[in-house]
UniProtKB/Swiss-Prot annotation:
Protein's UniProt keywords contain Transcription: yes
Gene source species: Chelativorans sp. (strain BNC1)
EC top class named in words: transferase
Residue sites binding Zn(2+) 1 per the record: C71, C73, C86, C89
Superkingdom classification of source: Bacteria
Cofactor dependence: Mg(2+); Zn(2+)
Protein name: DNA-directed RNA polymerase subunit beta'
Name of encoding gene: rpoC
Length: 1399
């Protein structure tokens, strides 16, 4: 009621509805139309009376009254004079709120260039005038004149003249024969006199005729700016301002502090500066002061305006009284503290509180304990309303009093209010959506919030002093969403991987594990029990223990729900757990009839969730939590010093290794091995020793021991903790009871003296010092990691935020091919894991029987996966977000299963944000360091190939010869070994590298694990293909080849050295040739000579004059093995991939199929030409630095996509050469590899969604009949639309190819300028948008949050749809009514306006 009365006297304009926001340059007329008056004086307020000065920065006549409905002099007060303008002080009588919206202006005495369009690179003014920024600044800051009208003189248009040159020109040509200007007036004149249409035409014709790349780029840049101005209707001269707007005074307040001082916004200082200089300049012009003084004043005015708009962009930063830089208008928007990120994207909210959390094990999963005091404060409005409704109070004031006194009826009402009203709990940092969940509050005494133990994993919370925030959803809709979508019981699965996240941890795991142990020779072993009653009785009377081996009957149901019972060999403990399992034929007793480690418990919960649904799972989880806690307590498993068993053999192993290290030291001193080799060998030896000590320790700790009566002793408690997955790991146990082993220095290299002691024995001072070295680095790393990981998440969210599920099915026939990922013979990710929850693109057919396992278009679920794996299928084609053809967002079928729900994804799900969170959230678990591989302590490259299935061998592109030793050697560069099953279907295919020895041939049968081929991982062989005699060319001792003797073995080897470093060797071309029986260079079968060009570091394997047969090695090139390279791992690697950076020494990839030819060498590069098999294509040539290990020979056949030079491929190259699918699989596999190393599960589809966002732009290659310019980057959606239109009109469509953008670049290039500006480089984004007159259609999530609307995802998307339907229905009804009454609206324009949202 009160509100309505207020509204009568205080009418608020209804909020305008709008569909889009446009940004453009403001013309002087526009600025004047906004303004309520000119500000002429720099004064702010009178310091005695605190009244604003007239015509000053806070003038009440211009901006409005200070008090509501009261003029400044006090002549008119009260509501009745509303709208009167006081004749004494000139103030309009109205609300003081208008001081937040009324603007003023300052008329400048001289024009001033807007710094954003001048200095924000690329400079718009510079591009338009085709001048360099330096030259423009010279004119602007009064150093040089610029010729604006050359007339008939020899001067050129836009030529710069210094003061002397200008004087000379005036003397020479006379003053009126030409015009030269200086300062912003000159720039304004030039911009105003530009004929944009003509310039655009000229540029286009010039573009068509030019051939140079650089020139083309420059013209393109200029044409783009010109077109922007033409399309947006902005005028270039508006970039130079004659009038500047002044923002409303309440947005730059001046607040009196006590003690007569004032706190003021920096903007007031900046405006004051501008007004002072402007007034001085006006006075100087009136006084007709000398030119030099006026010029100086104009320059100072330009600098003052620059500082107001963007302080520090040019010249010195202007500082305030306390030497602090003043905050200009640009700074208000920029960065984390700017308007966008501080106030628009992150707001503080009412009805929230925070407190410390404690554990609440007796809560149900959907509950949380809320302190009474907190609840009373949070739910105040609800309590007031209820007190009023029940008649305890008649006014809000009374209700307030009652609540303050905490009367008993208030507590009763609080109980009512809180019932079924969920609250949101949030723990910072909120890294993924499970960081905010809804719970039903239970009132508790005390001041700490109680949290259910099972949700701790999702919040990443522990109880060592963590705090959490509580928020109250107020509206009914918000409560509904909280209950249906955010309730903790609805978030059982992890959105990143689909694995359960409500899983017992720590104590609960320990209790369940203890309960499920089976010991030998326990009392009551071999007894049989009919039901739980008997068993309980036996346990209570201690006839059996929890761990006795018994037989028990387990009751469950069959498919039709009829009760059945089965007898299992089990333990009483497992029977107790089995009692809690929901009765379902798909949930057998076997899943808990085993040692329950954390993994097995997780599997158990997953099975229950899949087959029994959510409600059963929640009940089950709560029950096993209680069971776990109670048995962990009863078991009393503790951590004792004597549980850490130090192996007896430790001393012996260490002594052996010390002897070895001494021996290596001796060999080094004798000069047999190098320093590096010694280091590697010593480190290796200690690493092995450490491993063996650890193995011995584990053996001792694991050992099962029996007491005198033959009963099995209690298991080692540390082992139980570690093995169950409750706490601790073998690595930590090794440090406690084995030896600490090798330590790393901060740079990642390994210190060669290990720490021999363990923590139980204690470290010596030296050892302690060594161990602090690497440990401190670890701490520093952790701090950096958090920031880096957060920044990665922010970039990911920004690039993916507008990816939403918009339609049920796009009907595309494109997709990806999924295969299992195999690494060094191990299957890292099975085909089942990769296709689970995806939609099949084609029918998945069992190769043996021909039956269809999954029909095309169906979701592949757990059952299908079992069938697929059983049938041994190796490739499945699936739909993917990457290939989805929806214009904005993705479709539900391409996305597949919503991992957090286990059902097909809903329309409106913000899959982009979920993907970004899933990838970013584990970021803090990844490492930061670059690995330096030392010795074989880490990985040895794979050097052999084993059959992973049994079957028949088939060799594709067979090219093998038998060498002198009788081995089959691979001579082809793209030979593959396939293994076929009985039905002839391909089970596996392996590429075999050139020079490998191969042990099988076409048609051979192989068993699983049989060796197929092997090769030397550290060298690349050069093989001869013809028989003959070896001859050397240009191999001169000491210049191009040198002999080195390996002293430990006494073997000499000859290697090629850098011959170009000596003047004598500069034109040598070292090579090995094979001569035939006539002494001529032998010819190869495919043409060309048998000549091998050698690169630096190649080791010769044959002597001159030796006889060779095909397949023999003539030389070896040592490769950089994995152990000498620095491997970028962890977070930096993920960031590098998402940013699509080119790696340091990236691979060179062949663009076409063809034959390799060597061209003329070029300085220190080798020229390689690929001659295509397809005669319509042009040959492609590559330049490769000499001395890089390089393994192709003249005449080799090469396939598109093969590596010419090894290294990490650049993602852009993969996209250009092999296409989108290959790029996707490369990025997905590389990123997954980093996460897999840390044991983090992330579903492929999340990475695919991000890659989709990186591939949204098309580079125009041919313009056709479109207005595009070749080289333009255009949005895929827009490109398709333009082409569709052109095709309809029968014109030639534009051509383009997809471009890969890194995530930062992609975020900055989103169609929405609001979203881009709030991400990074705010000034640049806004400058660009203003020049182009961009329109933001508010499609993404971020823009809508910023303008304060519901986001177009989830329920917000549904609401928008409902509104659209409602609007169209209203229109229909109105039309009907109009027709019935037969009255047409008089003016059709009015009818249009009625339904039109304002711009």
């Amino acid at each position: 009621m009160n509100q309505e009365v207020m509204n009568l006297f205080n009418p608020q304009a209804p909020a305008q509805t709008f569909d889009s926001i446009r940004i453009s340059l403001a013309s002087p007329e526009k600025i004047l139309s906004w303004s309520y008056g000119e500000i002429k004086k720099p004064e702010t307020i009178n310091y005695r009376t605190f009244k604003p000065e007239r015509d000053g920065l806070f003038c009440a006549r211009i901006f409005g009254p200070i008090k509501d409905y009261e003029c400044l002099c006090g002549k008119y007060k009260r509501m009745k004079y509303k709208g009167v303008i006081c004749e004494k002080c000139g103030v309009e009588v109205t609300l003081s709120r208008v001081r937040r919206e009324r603007m003023g202006h300052i008329e400048l005495a001289a024009p001033v260039a807007h710094i954003w369009f001048l200095k924000s690179l690329p400079s718009r003014i510079g591009t338009l005038l085709d001048m360099t920024l330096k030259d423009i600044e010279r004119v602007l800051y009064f150093e040089n004149y610029i010729v604006t009208e050359p007339g008939l003189t020899a001067l050129k248009q836009n030529q710069l003249l210094s003061e002397e040159e200008y004087m000379m020109a005036v003397d020479e040509y006379g003053e009126d024969s030409f015009t030269a200007m200086i300062g912003a007036e000159a720039i304004h004149h030039l911009l105003a006199s530009m004929e944009l249409e003509k310039i655009a035409g000229d540029l286009r014709s010039e573009l068509a005729s030019t051939t140079s790349d650089l020139k083309q780029k420059k013209l393109l840049k200029r044409l783009k700016v010109v077109e922007n101005f033409l399309e947006s209707g902005n005028k270039p001269e508006w970039m130079v301002m004659k009038i500047i707007p002044v923002i409303p005074p309440d947005l730059r307040p001046l607040v009196p502090l006590d003690g007569g001082r004032f706190a003021t916004s920096d903007l007031n200082d900046l405006y004051r500066r501008v007004i002072n200089r402007n007034n001085r300049l006006k006075r100087l012009i009136e006084l007709k002061a000398p030119g030099i003084i006026i010029r100086n004043e104009k320059r100072m005015l330009q600098e003052a305006v620059d500082a107001l708009f963007d302080n520090g962009r040019r010249g010195r930063v202007i500082t305030g009284a306390n030497k602090r830089p003043l905050k200009s208008l640009s700074d208000m928007l920029k960065g984390k503290q700017g308007r966008f990120r501080q106030n628009l994207l992150g707001k503080r909210v009412d009805y929230s509180g925070r407190s410390v959390i404690v554990t609440g094990p007796e809560l149900k999963l959907h509950q949380c304990g809320l302190p009474k005091k907190m609840a009373l404060e949070l739910f105040k409005p609800f309590i007031y309303a209820r007190l009023d409704a029940k008649g305890y109070s008649s006014t809000v004031k009374q209700a307030k009093k009652l609540v303050e006194k905490e009367k008993p009826e208030v507590w009763d009402i609080l109980d009512e209010v809180i019932r079924e009203h969920p609250v949101l709990l949030n723990r910072a940092p909120t890294l993924h959506r499970l960081g905010i969940q809804a719970f039903e509050p239970i009132l508790i005494e005390g001041k700490a919030i109680q949290l259910h133990p099972l949700v701790c994993t999702a919040f990443n919370a522990d109880f060592d002093g963590d705090q959490m925030a509580v928020h109250v959803p107020l509206s009914l809709e918000a409560q509904l969403e909280a209950r249906v979508l955010m309730m903790s019981t609805n978030n059982i699965l992890h959105p990143a991987s689909g694995a359960p996240i409500i899983v017992p941890s720590q104590d609960m795991v320990l209790g369940l594990y203890y309960l499920s142990i089976m010991n030998q020779n326990e009392p009551g072993e071999g007894m049989v029990f009919a039901d739980m009653g008997e068993l309980q009785h036996a346990l209570e009377t201690k006839v059996v223990t929890l761990h006795s081996k018994i037989k028990g009957r387990y009751k469950t149901v069959d498919e039709n729900g009829n009760p059945v019972s089965m007898i299992y060999e089990t333990t009483p403990g497992r029977m107790i757990i089995g009692e809690l399992l929901p009765k379902n034929h798909n949930v057998p007793f076997d899943i808990c009839n085993q040692e329950l480690t954390k993994k097995n418990i997780s599997k158990m919960i997953d099975t229950v969730y899949r087959h029994c649904g959510q409600k059963e799972t929640v009940i089950f989880c709560d029950r096993i939590m209680a069971l776990g806690f109670s048995h962990a307590c009863k078991a009393g498993i503790s951590f004792g010093k004597d549980d850490m068993v130090i192996p007896e053999t430790k001393a012996k192993l260490i002594a052996e290794t010390e002897a070895l290290a001494k021996e290596y030291e001796q060999q080094y001193n004798d000069g047999l091995i190098t320093q590096g080799e010694k280091y590697n060998k010593v480190v290796d030896a200690w690493a092995k020793c450490s491993e063996r000590v650890a193995d011995e320790m584990m053996k001792r700790i694991k050992a099962i021991e029996f007491d005198d009566s033959g009963r099995q002793k209690q298991m080692n408690s540390i082992y139980m903790m570690s093995h169950s997955g409750a706490r601790g790991s073998p690595a930590q146990m090794r440090q406690l009871a084995g030896m600490r082993g090798l330590m790393a220095r901060p740079d990642g290299s390994i210190i060669e003296t290990p720490i021999i002691s363990n923590f139980k024995e204690g470290l010596t001072v030296m050892e302690y010092f060594n161990s602090t070295h690497g440990a401190r680095k670890g701490l520093a790393d952790t701090a950096l990691k958090t920031a880096n990981s957060g920044y990665l998440t922010r970039r990911l969210v920004d690039v993916a935020q507008d990816c939403i599920v918009v339609t049920p099915d796009c009907g595309t026939d494109k997709g990806l091919t999924m295969q299992p990922i195999v690494d060094a013979g191990q299957v890292v990710a099975s085909i089942g894991q990769r296709v689970l929850g995806r939609t099949a693109l084609d029918d998945v057919v069992n190769p043996a029987t021909g039956e269809v396992i999954v029909q095309a278009g169906r979701l592949i679920d757990e059952r299908d996966v079992e069938a697929i794996e059983a049938a041994g299928i190796q490739t499945v084609r699936i739909r993917s977000a990457l290939t989805c053809e929806v214009r904005t967002g993705v479709c539900a079928v391409c996305y597949g299963r919503d991992l957090a729900r286990g059902t097909p994804v809903n329309i409106g799900e913000a899959v982009g944000v979920i993907a970004a969170q899933s990838i970013g959230e584990p970021g803090t678990q990844l490492t930061m360091r670059t690995f330096h591989m030392g010795g074989t302590a880490q990985v040895v490259d794979q050097s052999f190939l084993e059959a992973s299935f049994e079957g028949t061998v088939k060799i594709r592109n067979r090219n093998v010869v038998r060498n002198s030793d009788g081995h089959l050697v691979v001579m082809g560069r793209n030979m593959a070994v396939l293994i076929l099953d009985e039905a002839g279907a391909e089970r596996a295919s392996h590429k075999v590298t050139y020079g490998s020895r191969i042990f099988v041939d076409d048609g051979d049968k192989v068993k699983r694990g049989q060796r197929i081929a092997e090769w030397d991982p550290y060298t690349r062989p050069m093989l001869t293909e013809v028989e003959g005699t070896v001859a050397f060319e240009d191999l001169v001792d000491g210049i191009s080849v040198q002999e080195t003797t390996d002293e430990s073995t006494g073997i000499t080897k000859r290697e090629v050295i850098d011959w170009r470093s000596t003047p004598r060797g500069s034109d040598l071309k070292p090579a090995i040739t094979i001569l035939d029986s006539k002494g001529k260079v032998a010819k190869l079968a495919r043409g060309g000579d048998a000549r091998f060009l050698l690169s630096v570091e190649t080791v010769l394997s044959v002597d001159s004059g030796a006889k060779v047969r095909p397949g023999d090695v003539v030389a070896r090139i040592p490769t950089e093995s994995a152990r000498t390279k620095d491997i970028t791992g962890g977070l930096p690697r993920v960031a590098e991939l998402f940013e699509a950076r080119r790696p340091k020494d990236h691979a060179i990839i062949a663009e076409i199929d063809g034959t390799v030819r060597f061209g003329r060498d070029y300085k220190n590069k080798r020229r390689i030409i690929i001659e295509p098999h397809d005669s319509t294509l042009e040959p492609v040539e590559y330049l490769i630095p000499k001395g890089k290990p390089f393994h192709l020979q003249d005449g080799d056949v090469i396939e598109k996509g093969d590596f010419i030079l090894d290294g990490n491929p650049a993602p852009h190259d993969i996209l250009a050469i092999k296409g989108v699918e290959a790029l996707a699989s490369y990025l997905v596999n590389e990123i997954q590899e980093v996460y897999r190393l840390q044991g983090v599960l992330i579903n492929d589809k999340h990475i695919e969604v991000i890659v989709r966002q990186m591939l949204q732009k098309v580079e125009i290659t041919a313009q056709g009949d479109s207005t595009y310019i070749p080289g333009d980057h255009v949005d895929q959606v827009e490109f398709d639309e333009v082409n569709d239109r052109l095709v309809e009109e029968g014109k030639k469509p534009a051509e383009g190819q997809p471009v890969l953008l890194g995530i930062t670049k992609a975020s900055l290039q989103t169609p929405s300028f609001i979203s881009a500006a709030s991400f990074q480089e705010t000034t640049r984004v806004l400058t660009e948008a203003a020049v182009a007159g961009k329109i933001d259609t508010l499609q993404g999530l971020k823009e809508n949050v910023i303008v304060g609307r519901l986001i177009p995802a989830g329920t917000g998307g549904a609401m928008a749809q409902i509104r659209r339907i409602a609007r169209s229905r209203d229109d229909l009804i109105l039309d009907e009514r109009r027709k019935e009454s037969g009255v047409e609206m008089a003016n059709p324009a009015i009818a249009d306006m009625a339904g039109q949202p304002a711009e």
